[in-house]
Amino acid sequence: MATSGRLGFTVRSLLNLPEQDAKPRVRREQQTCVPQTAAWLESECSHYLSSDESGLETSPADSSQLASLRRESPGSDPEKRRKRRVLFSKAQTLELERRFRQQRYLSAPEREQLARLLRLTPTQVKIWFQNHRYKLKRGRAPGITEPSDMAASSDLHAAPGLLRRVVVPVLVHDRPPSNNGRGEGTSAVPQDKCSARLATACPVPGYTAFGPGSALGLFPAYQHLAPPALVSWNW
């Protein structure tokens, strides 16, 4: 029974060989497998570490190259993109404003002459005039007119008032006096009738009607003169 319990399907059991060496062989196989796996893991780790280190080493170089490329590119520099603003001195500004009040548009020779006088370039003078014209148009309200237009309109508004106050006497050509004394009254009466007819037939709005002898009443220096109807002709 003891021999039957030791029987198995292994080669050693069939050949009746001792089974003591079976465990050391398994240990040797395990030992041989462990170094192989360890070597494989070390190789993989070294590969990944070398790739990471190489990436870390090359990243500063890449960043420096990118920085140099950005510096060399013309559109990346903010100082180059931003236009340099021209600062005018007080004397230059006063002269430009004085010339702008005289003349808002300059020709090319005038622009060059003014730029030479102020030690500027013609382009700077041209841009200053353009900006000043734009500011003037933008700051002007729609209802505000030019100073010349305002003066002309004030003169037009003031003209009717002056016409109302100033009365110009109309001189009527008198006929030569006759030798008869009767001609004195007959020559003056038709004149008064004509003046009265003109005053009533042609009324002017805003003007007051004056009588035949009231025109001289506006001028104190001529009040001592009598109306034409009262003058007697002595020949």
From Swiss-Prot:
One cellular component term from this protein's GO annotations in UniProt: nucleus
Basic and acidic residues compositional bias, start-end = 69-80
Q: In which tissues is it expressed?
A: Prominent expression in ventral brain and neural tube structures.
Give the matching Pfam families: Homeodomain
Question: Which InterPro entries does the record match to this protein?
Answer: HD (IPR001356), HD_metazoa (IPR020479), Homeobox_CS (IPR017970), Homeobox_NK-like (IPR050394), Homeodomain-like_sf (IPR009057)
Question: Is the keyword Cytoplasm assigned to this protein?
Answer: no
Which GO biological process entries does UniProt record here?
Answer: axonogenesis; epithelial cell proliferation; lung development; negative regulation of epithelial cell proliferation; respiratory tube development; transcription by RNA polymerase II
Under SUPFAM superfamilies, the record lists: Homeodomain-like
Keyword Nucleus belongs to the record: yes
Entry GO MF terms: DNA-binding transcription activator activity, RNA polymerase II-specific; RNA polymerase II cis-regulatory region sequence-specific DNA binding
Where in or outside the cell it occurs: the entry states: Nucleus
Gene3D superfamilies for this protein: Homeodomain-like
User: What are the UniProt keywords, alphabetically?
Assistant: Developmental protein, DNA-binding, Homeobox, Nucleus
The record's region (Disordered) falls at: 51-86
State the DNA-binding region(s): 81-140
Name the domain of life this protein comes from. Answer: Eukaryota
Q: Where is the composition biased (Polar residues)?
A: 51-67
Regarding protein family, the annotation reads: Belongs to the NK-2 homeobox family.
Any idea what this protein is called?
Homeobox protein Nkx-2.8
